[in-house]
């Protein structure tokens, strides 16, 4: 979680990135995607198109996703595939997700995955859309991280943010 938070703190400094909630129901996520819709100009055709981009960060994957909620899992698979989504309710009207673009970084443990991922999450395609990063040991133990920081830390952070801005502008 600490490492993910460092990266997300850098990304939050980049203008134009839409961040979603870290704890959400699938219905609220559809609503958030609808609100995140924005227009962009296709550099090839000069045509204006709509997209619904969202970046979600969750310090605990289990807070973001209930693996037993098949509707949420199926909706995430559809969103990752770039499929549009329309939700219509009797009292709340409708929410449209056009050209979704979803990025999720969520932290958990191998034990949580083993104990909570049912077979359909693996066979149904959810895990094939995920990149699992795992380390079985710490690279180094640092009791007081502030004492181990390089003197040019602020400059390095600025350069990383500038790189992220460059990537986001493409």
Question: What annotation goes with each model-predicted range?
Answer:
Residues 1-170:
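Phosphate-handling catalytic cores of nucleic-acid transaction enzymes
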């Amino acid at each position: 979680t600490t490492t993910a938070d460092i990266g997300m703190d850098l990304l939050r400094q980049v203008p134009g990135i839409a961040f979603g909630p870290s704890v959400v129901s699938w219905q609220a996520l559809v609503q958030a995607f609808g609100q995140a819709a924005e227009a962009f100009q296709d550099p090839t055709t000069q045509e204006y198109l709509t997209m619904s981009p969202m970046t979600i960060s969750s310090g605990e994957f289990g807070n973001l996703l209930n693996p037993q909620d098949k509707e949420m899992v199926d909706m995430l698979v559809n969103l990752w595939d770039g499929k549009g989504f329309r939700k219509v309710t009797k009292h709340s009207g409708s929410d449209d997700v056009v050209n979704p673009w979803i990025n999720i970084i969520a932290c958990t443990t191998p034990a949580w995955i083993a104990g909570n991922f049912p077979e359909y999450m693996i066979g149904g395609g959810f895990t094939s859309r995920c990149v699992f990063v795992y380390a079985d040991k710490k690279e180094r133990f640092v009791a007081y991280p502030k004492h181990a920081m390089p003197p040019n830390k602020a400059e390095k952070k600025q350069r990383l943010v500038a790189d992220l801005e460059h990537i986001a502008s493409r």
